[in-house]
Amino acid sequence: MDAPPFGLFLDVDGPVSSPATRTVPAPLLDDLLTLLARGIPVVLNTGRSTDFVLAQVVAPLRDRGLPAGARLHAVCEKGATWVSAGDGRVHADPELTVPAVCHELLETLIADYGDAMFVDRTKRAMATVEARTDVPPEVYGRRQREFDADLLAGLTAARLGVRLRDQRFPDADGRTPWRIDPSVIATDVEADASGKALGARRGLALLAADGPLPRAWHTVGDSRSDYAMADELHGRGDDVTHVDVSPQGPLTGTPYAVTAVPGLVYEAAGAAYLSGLLPT
């Protein structure tokens, strides 16, 4: 088997799934299927759960005729869980699973914050609350900041070592093994060792097990943390183009190419970029 001309590492929320509706546009699925059918390897590198990715991305691709040998893998919960489209078996790293008190705290807090968010109970390793789709972003953002403050207070009261952005609150041993990570539509409690770089390494291992690896990659994301995918691949000596679909626009000064889709953001930009990769 010859090495494919390029591979894809895709964040899901934003580049693939709409942050507003949490659904995937049909044309994007069609183009992704075409790329997979032509042997392009694809890794979905996301904070989403395997349940979400299997239902919203993999199942619709299967309905469209996903080939049995398609090289499609999902690394979820920022590297803590993963699944391959071929067998559907979900794997999890127990060392990246948050303590039960994190889930218990979310269930307690949601009683006061259910007007703006809900608990994502599909997560296997992380503990997550997500914005309700019927709540305006500015309302969710305000409530999220209040929630995050209460969450931090609860986790530190439970004597967990935790980090929120640049603030560190060590445990009795001086460690901060856990992280609160707010995003546009969610707040995650996760292992500090997790992240998009770990997801990229897991994705490479999954691809290496089913065929040759390309030496050129397109990574697509909507947050600054998604650049870690490109950093990881560039560090291997591969040719990388990172596509930033966020409203903020791309970073400058990276050692690899960074681009955007003029006039488009989120899933519209992701769909347009994937369409442009199709052979003419």
Predicted features by range, described:
Residues 2-7, 25, 190, 197-280:
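Mg2+-dependent phosphoryl-transfer enzymes with acidic/Ser/Thr/Gly-rich catalytic loops
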Residues 6-12, 44:
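Short, hydrophobic/glycine-enriched beta-strand segments
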Residues 26, 98-109, 140-164, 268-272:
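Well-ordered, non-membrane alpha-helical segments in soluble/globular domains
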Residues 27-123:
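Active-site phosphate-binding/coordination module
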Residues 53-57, 129-133, 227-232, 254:
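A short acidic (Asp/Glu
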Residues 118-218, 231:
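Conserved acidic, metal-coordinating active-site core of Asp-based
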